[in-house]
Curated annotation (Swiss-Prot):
The gene is infB. It holds the Pfam family IF-2. CDD domains: IF2_eIF5B, IF2_mtIF2_II, mtIF2_IVc. It is found in: Cytoplasm. Residues 533-537 are annotated as: G2. The keyword Protein biosynthesis applies. It comes from Corynebacterium glutamicum (strain ATCC 13032 / DSM 20300 / JCM 1318 / BCRC 11384 / CCUG 27702 / LMG 3730 / NBRC 12168 / NCIMB 10025 / NRRL B-2784 / 534). This is Translation initiation factor IF-2. One of the essential components for the initiation of protein synthesis. Protects formylmethionyl-tRNA from spontaneous hydrolysis and promotes its binding to the 30S ribosomal subunits. Also involved in the hydrolysis of GTP during the formation of the 70S ribosomal complex.
């Protein structure tokens, strides 16, 4: 079978444009998308008929007959071809003789014979013609469109001649394609020629595999034998849509269904219908077997075909309107007692006489192209159709012309710094629609940019969604759960748990003696090494002390007391078991003391108060107890539960008593146990970049045992433990619970306070670190992004004074503390502080290059520039500031910000004068003769002219000033002068107020 034609190919054959052909197809009910779409052969044939194409064009889509091998004889029921399917012709057979024409062939086109009436042949029937019925009747032609009268079906006398007889009596037929001679010498009817087949009703579907192309052949009226008509116009094959040839299958099925005798009727004779394709002698010289009656169909098999091949399908034959039953107007459905007139829709159905006619049925593939045929009926709607109709009934959620989905109160969980693309994936919407909707709400963002939490929640409320931004803790927990990891829980049962030393954090105000206390306990001197005598980092030590003749191990954390190290104190409180609050007896409760109390209470950590410096004469321990009572720390001697110990760190007084109190609190209030056999988990309390060792993290192991060679992940850094050292610089191979160690081997400097976790291999550690890093960047981008509305766009584009800084420090905690302290500086909106980069380690050339490009200042805290960074900074003019004490860096940055502020000016009145007379001069105009009443009048000063208490001129200038005939710079009170003003509209008795704008220094 040749390939299917496309729309543009058929249009080229027909000599029209593709657009015209598409329009015609649409009018005919064939819905084809584009000019490149393929068309089924029946539709091609219809279009060719519609546009009057030549026969050569039609031959492209017709099924070509091909020779087939002779098949074994089969029963007639199985030999009948399927309706609508092209049948291959048999091998060359005997040319059939034409059958005798009946009266029906001479009837008008569209006329249908009455049921039960068989036309009498004009001459003796040739072999192969249909047999004469038992009760012949005169032919009567019905008008086109009239319904035939019901009558009982007449049974034929016999089924027809045998194939052998038909072969003997057959006459030579004309060549294929030529017109066959009319039997009996009957002349051709002289009526009007058969009309050319025109356009038919739209097909049900463009499907070549449907039964009969979506149509059902009409039954023959009366069930009698088919009239032996002459050759059809053009001598073509059987027209499409004619009655099904009789046979066992048709007779049996239709006879049983309708209760009629011979629904299928006799099969057309061998000679009827013109010559066979590739006309040759039929094998064994037989004609086609005739269709039997209902009894024969049900009781005995029909005669077998001897030809072995199938005849052409009705779907392959052109229509013959002259022999087609007329269509009755009206709707389809089952016919009545009147023989079931022609069916509606696309079928030409009709029942047999005396029975209920079968109406038109739907096409084989209903709904493929256009509405199905037959009578319209209400079917069940699909779920999708119902859902679409329901959603269309709902009020659309439209924001600024953009249709968005309605959340109906659903909850959406998004990570920090999520983008609109992430939001769109969650709700199944288009990211571009969300961008446009947010633009209409006054926010300008892209689909992939990180969006702040407030913006996500605002957009969610507009779409009726509840947006929950996942907290950092939940986000990290979900990340670890995706790798089947957990942090913060001991593995195993209680039998696997063992006691661990307490972790004690020393907290308090600056210069109250925290580091001196630890020095006394460790019998070392650490405070002398600190810059400025203050602690600027967390120190972790593990010492062994004798408490009540028992050696106990205690881990101490020394936190800074300066106000800039709030985050460090909070981190120390979270990593500890017991907090020792150091308060100087001669100083009292200070702001950082109160802050330390709040941190300890927030972490639910028991507090032991150490009242220090009791050796000083002005010390008042009782005063300290009274002050701390206001903050909920009630001494035991006052009936409370807080232990107070009076000590002197400098002289070493009562240190043992303090350690005993710490151990007593740990034993009484805390159950300090951990599993030492599990994979290690801990916290990085400090981290820095060492010149020779690389990134170094100070870690406290909270549970498990950390060993050299373990794969670890700390925050957004990962690596393998290459070396561990204790607080004395000695190498250790493993570290158990509550043990502080310095870990080397990470790929970067972790953040202070990041959790440390041992994982199975480096691959998992790298994946966790990379995902944490990506989330951290998104959150930072969302937080640092400024919300710019359309109304504020003009003001944002104006130039602002911005101080760009690059922070470098010796460890992560110092950089964090410095950044937080700088961001807390309160300044006006006209000056902004922007920290563009931060890092741990020396100042590098990369930092200098970035500073030069962004006009930034580098703040180096406890680090210096390395290599050629200093030379490059001098060449580029980059300002690098070095500091060793954090509060000095804060003070200088604050002063620099204040210096960038625009000056504040204040108006100051310097004198008043009154116009007494006005003179005119051609060269200068009006001259005001004035008397200075108070103050001074200066040349080029700014004046305000007042008339009758109303200001008539503002910001006028004294252009010229004279005293007598001499020019004067200023004139004092009590003197007359003449002046020329820049404002010409002056009059006598006007008051002149002279003032100047003076810069006022800003308050510190």
């Amino acid at each position: 079978m040749p390939g299917k034609l496309r729309v543009h190919e058929l249009a080229k054959q027909l000599g029209i444009t593709s657009k015209e052909l598409l329009a015609t197809l649409k009018d005919k009910g064939e819905f084809v998308k584009t000019a490149s779409s393929t068309i089924e052969p029946p539709v091609v044939k219809r279009m060719q008929e519609h546009y009057g194409s030549s026969g050569s064009d039609k031959s492209d889509t017709a099924a070509k007959p091909a020779a087939a091998k002779p098949a074994a004889p089969k029963p007639a029921a199985s030999a009948a071809p399927k309706p609508g399917a092209p049948a291959k012709p048999a091998a060359p057979a005997a040319k059939p003789a034409p059958a005798a024409p009946s009266a029906a062939s001479a009837a008008k086109p569209g006329a249908a014979p009455k049921p039960g009436v068989q036309a009498k042949p004009a001459a003796a029937a040739k072999p192969g013609a249909p047999a004469k019925p038992a009760a012949p009747a005169a032919p009567s032609a019905a008008k086109s469109g009239s319904a035939p009268k019901p009558a009982a079906a007449a049974k034929p006398a016999f089924s027809g001649p045998t194939p052998g007889d038909a072969a003997k009596k057959a006459e030579p037929a004309a060549k294929p394609g030529a017109e066959a001679p009319r039997p009996g010498g009957m002349p051709r009817p002289m009526g009007k020629p058969a009309p050319k087949p025109g356009a038919r009703a739209p097909r049900v579907a463009n499907n070549p595999f449907s039964t009969g192309g979506g149509e059902r052949p009409a039954p023959r009226p009366g069930g009698g034998p088919r009239p032996g008509g002459g050759p059809r116009p053009g001598g073509g094959p059987r027209p499409q849509g004619q009655g099904r040839p009789g046979g066992q299958r048709d007779g049996q099925r239709d006879g049983q269904r309708d209760g009629q005798g011979n629904r299928g009727g006799q099969r057309q004779g061998a000679g009827a219908g013109g010559p066979r394709p590739q006309g040759g002698p039929r094998p064994q010289g037989g004609s086609r077997p005739q269709g039997g009656s209902a009894q024969g169909a049900q009781g005995a098999p029909s005669q077998e075909r001897q030809g072995g091949g199938r005849r052409p399908s009705p779907a392959m034959m052109p229509p013959t309107p002259g022999q087609m039953p007329a269509k009755a107007p009206g709707k389809g459905g089952r016919g009545g007692q009147a023989g079931g007139g022609a069916g509606g829709g696309f079928n030409r159905g009709g029942g047999t006489g005396g029975g209920a006619g079968r109406g038109g049925r739907r096409g084989g593939t209903a709904g493929a192209f256009g509405r199905p045929g037959g009578a319209p009926r209400r079917g069940r709607k699909s779920k999708r159709q119902k859902r679409n109709e329901y959603e269309s009934m709902q009020a659309p959620n439209v924001i600024g012309g953009v249709r968005l989905p309605d959340g109906k109160g659903a909850t959406i969980r998004l990570a920090r710094g999520a983008s609109l693309a992430d939001f769109a994936d969650k709700i199944g919407a288009d990211a571009a629609a969300l961008v446009q909707a947010l633009f209409n709400l006054g926010e300008m963002v892209t689909a992939t940019a990180s969006v702040s939490d407030e913006t996500l929640q605002l957009l969610g409320e507009e779409m009726n969604y509840k947006v929950q931004v996942v907290s950092p803790e939940d986000e990290d927990r979900e990340l670890l759960e995706s790798f089947d990891l957990q942090f913060g829980e001991d593995e195993g049962g209680e039998a696997d748990l063992a006691k661990r030393p307490p972790v004690v954090t020393v907290m308090g105000h600056v210069d109250h003696g925290k580091t001196r206390l630890l020095d006394t306990i460790r019998k070392a001197n650490v405070g002398s090494d600190e810059a400025g005598g203050i602690t600027q980092g967390i120190g972790a030590y593990q010492v062994k002390v004798n408490v009540e003749d028992t050696e106990r191990t205690i881990t101490f954390l020394d936190t800074p007391g300066h106000e800039a190290f709030t985050a460090m104190r909070a981190r120390g409180a979270k990593s500890t078991d017991i907090a020792v609050l150091v308060v100087a007896a001669d100083d009292g409760v200070m702001p950082q003391t109160v802050e330390a109390i709040n941190h300890a209470k927030a972490a639910d950590v028991p507090i032991v108060v150490a009242v220090n410096k009791i050796d000083k004469p002005e010390a008042s321990p009782e005063k300290i107890r009274g002050q701390l009572t206001e903050y909920g720390l009630i001494p035991e001697e006052y009936g409370g539960d807080t232990i107070f110990v009076d000590i002197s760190a400098k002289q070493g007084l009562n240190i043992d008593e303090l350690l005993a109190s710490v151990c007593l609190t740990a034993d009484a209030e805390l159950d300090l146990v951990a599993n030492p056999e599990m994979d290690a988990q801990g916290v990085a309390i400090e981290a820095h970049l060492d010149r020779g060792r690389g990134p170094v993290a100070t870690v406290i192991v909270q549970r498990g045992t950390l060993r050299v060679g373990d794969s670890i992940v700390a925050g957004d850094t990962y690596g393998r433990v290459r070396r561990m050292v204790d607080e004395y610089g000695r190498d250790v191979e493993e570290a158990g619970p509550s043990r502080p160690v310095q870990v080397q081997g990470l790929n970067g400097v972790p953040g202070a306070g990041d959790n440390l976790l041992v994982v199975e291999d480096d691959r998992i550690a790298r994946q966790i670190a990379n995902q944490r890093n990506a989330r951290k960047r998104n959150a930072l981008a969302a937080r640092s992004r400024k919300r710019v509305s359309l109304e504020d766009l003009d003001s944002v584009l104006k130039e602002h004074s911005t101080l760009n800084l690059i922070l470098k420090g010796d460890n992560a905690g110092s950089v964090e503390a410095l950044e937080e302290a700088l961001l807390k500086i309160e300044m006006d909106d006209e000056v902004q502080l922007n920290i563009i980069d931060r890092g741990v380690g020396a100042v590098t050339q990369t930092n200098v290059t970035l500073a030069a490009a962004s006009d930034a200042v580098i703040i180096a805290f406890n680090v210096r520039a390395e290599g050629k960074a200093t030379e490059e900074a001098n060449a580029e003019g980059v300002d690098v500031r070095y500091y060793t004490i954090i509060y000095r860096a804060i003070e200088e940055v604050e002063a620099a910000l204040k210096g960038m502020l625009k000056p504040i000016y204040e108006e100051r009145v310097i004198g008043h004068a009154e116009i007494r007379a006005i003179f005119k001069a051609s060269s200068v105009g009006l001259i005001a003769g004035c008397m200075v009443e108070d103050g001074k009048v200066r040349r080029n000063a700014t004046v305000r002219i007042i008339r009758d208490g109303n200001v008539i001129a503002e910001n006028a200038k004294i252009v010229s000033l004279r005293r007598e005939k001499d020019d004067a710079t200023e004139v004092s009170a009590g003197y007359e002068c003449g002046m020329v003003l820049s404002y010409p509209d002056i009059s006598v008795d006007d008051k002149i107020e002279v003032y100047e704008m003076v810069e006022v220094p800003r308050e510190a």
